[in-house]
Design a protein with these regions (language model features):
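Conserved glycine-rich cofactor-binding loop
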Residues: 7, 14-16, 38
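Active-site loop immediately N-terminal to the catalytic Tyr-X3-Lys motif
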Residues: 98-101, 148-154, 176-177, 212
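The beta1-alpha1 cofactor-binding region of Rossmann-like NAD(H)/NADP(H)-dependent oxidoreductases
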Residues: 39, 62-73, 105
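Active-site helix of classical SDR
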Residues: 123, 159, 167
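Alpha-helical segment proximal to the catalytic Tyr-Lys
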Residues: 128, 172-176
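Substrate-binding pocket helix/loop in short-chain dehydrogenase/reductase
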Residues: 99-100, 104-112, 194, 202-205
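Residue(s) in the substrate-gating loop at a strand-loop-helix junction
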Residues: 143
């Protein structure tokens, strides 16, 4: 098991890519904290994961990723329980498909606060401990639309472009301190979040996929 006894926090871990990541990490022997938007969602995810991995060590937390104080408080609980934090997966994110001419400041802030500020808050909460241990991994979930853009909902690709820049900068700064910082950029993926995206937005994206499917 490649991650045996490693301690990982996965934001947005209650569904979609985050839940699949938690499942994979547990299968590889990691101890996992699933961070979700609510205590109810976190507990539901933990219950599902324990049904798959009865002997696994997995807990749920529900930080407000827009608040550093909330994130630090919840992450400290994980560190207190497991002794350290080895891996942070910044996966939580929100997307929408509002045309630019209908965008409001509140729409923009909602996306940026979670997708960009949330990455800062979560990473800032763990990095001191990782530096002290001269070891750690930060993995950010970006998106292919950070490169290609998309025809509606401009704030999502803009936020993921910011994640790319954050990843590169932190990799340069933290690498000499023993911390690896990387990003993955999935294409359009069939998750719960995509159910809210209209067909007229999804279909042109699917047309660009060689297999013509999600």
């Amino acid at each position: 098991m490649r991650l045996k006894d490693k301690v990982a926090i996965i934001t947005g871990g209650s569904r979609g890519i985050g839940f699949a990541t938690a499942d994979a990490f547990l299968r590889e022997g990691a101890k996992v904290a699933v961070a979700a938007s609510s205590e109810k969602n976190a507990e539901a995810a933990v219950e599902k994961l324990k049904a798959i991995h009865p002997d696994a060590e997995v807990v749920g937390i529900s930080p407000n990723l827009g608040s550093f104080e909330s994130v630090k408080e919840e992450f400290d609980k994980v560190e207190k329980q497991f002794g350290r934090i080895d891996i942070l997966v910044n996966n939580a994110g929100v997307s929408e498909s509002t045309p630019f001419t209908s965008y409001t400041e509140a729409d923009f802030d909602r996306v940026i606060d979670l997708n960009v500020k949330g990455v800062f808050n979560a990473t800032r909460a763990v990095v001191d401990g990782m530096i002290k241990n001269h070891s750690g991994v930060v993995l950010n979930t970006s998106s292919m639309v950070s490169i290609s853009g998309q025809p509606s909902g401009f704030a999502y690709p803009a936020s993921k472009f910011a994640v790319n820049g954050t990843t590169i900068s932190l990799a340069r700064e933290l690498g000499p301190k023993g911390i690896r910082v990387n990003a993955v950029a999935p294409g359009i993926t069939e998750t719960d979040m995509m159910k809210a995206v209209p067909k007229n937005v999804i279909e042109p994206m699917i047309a660009q996929i060689p297999l013509r499917r999600l």
